Amino acid sequence: MNFETVIGLEVHVELKTQSKIFSSSPTPFGAAANTQTSVIDLGYPGVLPVLNKEAVNFAMKAAMALNCEIATDTKFDRKNYFYPDNPKAYQISQFDKPIGENGWIEIEVEGKTKRIGITRLHLEEDAGKLTHTGDGYSLVDFNRQGTPLVEIVSEPDIRTPEEAYAYLEKLKSIIQYTGVSDCKMEEGSLRCDANISLRPIGREEFGTKTELKNLNSFAFVQKGLEFEEKRQEQVLLSGGLIEQETRRYDEASKKTILMRVKEGSDDYRYFPEPDLVELYIDDEWKERVRASIPELPDERRKRYIDDLGLPAYDAMVLTLTKEMSDFFEATITEGAEAKQASNWLMGEVSAYLNSAQKELEDTKLTPQGLAGMIKLIEKGTISSKIAKKVFKELIENGGDAETIVKEKGLVQISDEGALLKLVTEALDNNPQSIEDFRNGKDRAIGFLVGQIMKASKGQANPPMVNKILLEEIKKR
């Protein structure tokens, strides 16, 4: 029997507001434990929540960017459960009237475009953070308690772990472009749970789903889903039944491990939040928020292709992250040619960032520095080979490209007399290469050019070297 995989994703995104959703407590990441909390966050008796309007604006902005319909009437509800990181024993969330519904995004997998539906986007408060010491007790930090977040629930339209990965990449990109969140998984501002089930091909009814947690990266999401897909298939083929349960992905064993039997929504005993009135969002408010949405990745990608003449692949890679795209924009604003700027960002810059495991913001490279270097290449002041030395200096120490070239004596040698001397020495020292070239071995020219570049420490002008070299060989 062949099965079809059905995947749905629940993504939690912390909103980048200055204060929490129902209190004035600050939200910056990295503060000492339990220094960014208040009696409201901790649920002391007699305190009342006050809704943060900016959190509502940010949630609407995210929902609109994801093509959701924005509710006119929305409300908050209590989601009741006990856990040490939840001091009130309930979480203020949204149940039956979310702020956004019926959205979608488009992903590309293996050259094909697919639309993934978004069931809903709702506002809620985050919980605290538990740290398990391994000594029989756990520590709790309530700094995160009450931080505003949106939960984005996809339709069960995803059919492969690869599609799940592509969906998360696209969702993260869109949210980052709106500016409502930095989406840093390492800081917990983006978290994902995955639901997966299998059903016989052709059947409409869904199979029993399993929820996956402890997915600390998009790669873990994909790996966890791949393992769970195989596990469920083996269970079903052997005549077993899939239990509705929550499992976690363990990177060490590369398996999913049972955490608990999954609870249903009824177990949370949702009821309307009595301390908050229903929220009315009129058309004027919606339009103000809509007008604040910046250019999104798909729009920017189209502009790069249509207006800047970039290949579709370049445009796609450059717009994957807002940081890279903004850097590219600033670089061409400084006068760099678009394709050259794209080549450097996709090539040397990306290679350096991957190797050093850094973000662009963690380096000394500036758009002005990169643009200056590209212009020096275009003018013939430096060669592409020398440019790599300049680039290393720019990204590690910063500075001005022209100044670096002058101080380090990296100006390209374009003087014909100096180049003729280098060519003559190379020919005198390698007579066999001359014979090889005359006998049809074109690689001999490459060898001679290499000798000249080595002698000039990479500073000889390659096109001029080739020209003079061919002329001098003819004379011999």
Curated annotation (Swiss-Prot):
<keyword id="KW-0436">Ligase</keyword>
<dbReference type="InterPro" id="IPR017958">
    <property type="entry name" value="Gln-tRNA_amidoTrfase_suB_CS"/>
</dbReference>
<dbReference type="GO" id="GO:0006412">
    <property type="term" value="P:translation"/>
</dbReference>
<dbReference type="InterPro" id="IPR006075">
    <property type="entry name" value="Asn/Gln-tRNA_Trfase_suB/E_cat"/>
</dbReference>
<dbReference type="InterPro" id="IPR014746">
    <property type="entry name" value="Gln_synth/guanido_kin_cat_dom"/>
</dbReference>
<dbReference type="GO" id="GO:0050566">
    <property type="term" value="F:asparaginyl-tRNA synthase (glutamine-hydrolyzing) activity"/>
</dbReference>
<dbReference type="GO" id="GO:0005524">
    <property type="term" value="F:ATP binding"/>
</dbReference>
<dbReference type="InterPro" id="IPR003789">
    <property type="entry name" value="Asn/Gln_tRNA_amidoTrase-B-like"/>
</dbReference>
<protein>
    <recommendedName>
        <fullName>Aspartyl/glutamyl-tRNA(Asn/Gln) amidotransferase subunit B</fullName>
        <ecNumber>6.3.5.-</ecNumber>
    </recommendedName>
</protein>
<comment type="similarity">
    <text>Belongs to the GatB/GatE family. GatB subfamily.</text>
</comment>
<dbReference type="Pfam" id="PF02934">
    <property type="entry name" value="GatB_N"/>
</dbReference>
<dbReference type="Pfam" id="PF02637">
    <property type="entry name" value="GatB_Yqey"/>
</dbReference>
<dbReference type="GO" id="GO:0070681">
    <property type="term" value="P:glutaminyl-tRNAGln biosynthesis via transamidation"/>
</dbReference>
<dbReference type="GO" id="GO:0050567">
    <property type="term" value="F:glutaminyl-tRNA synthase (glutamine-hydrolyzing) activity"/>
</dbReference>
<dbReference type="InterPro" id="IPR017959">
    <property type="entry name" value="Asn/Gln-tRNA_amidoTrfase_suB/E"/>
</dbReference>
<dbReference type="InterPro" id="IPR018027">
    <property type="entry name" value="Asn/Gln_amidotransferase"/>
</dbReference>
<dbReference type="InterPro" id="IPR004413">
    <property type="entry name" value="GatB"/>
</dbReference>
<comment type="subunit">
    <text>Heterotrimer of A, B and C subunits.</text>
</comment>
<keyword id="KW-0067">ATP-binding</keyword>
<keyword id="KW-0648">Protein biosynthesis</keyword>
<dbReference type="InterPro" id="IPR023168">
    <property type="entry name" value="GatB_Yqey_C_2"/>
</dbReference>
<dbReference type="InterPro" id="IPR042114">
    <property type="entry name" value="GatB_C_1"/>
</dbReference>
<keyword id="KW-0547">Nucleotide-binding</keyword>
<comment type="function">
    <text>Allows the formation of correctly charged Asn-tRNA(Asn) or Gln-tRNA(Gln) through the transamidation of misacylated Asp-tRNA(Asn) or Glu-tRNA(Gln) in organisms which lack either or both of asparaginyl-tRNA or glutaminyl-tRNA synthetases. The reaction takes place in the presence of glutamine and ATP through an activated phospho-Asp-tRNA(Asn) or phospho-Glu-tRNA(Gln).</text>
</comment>
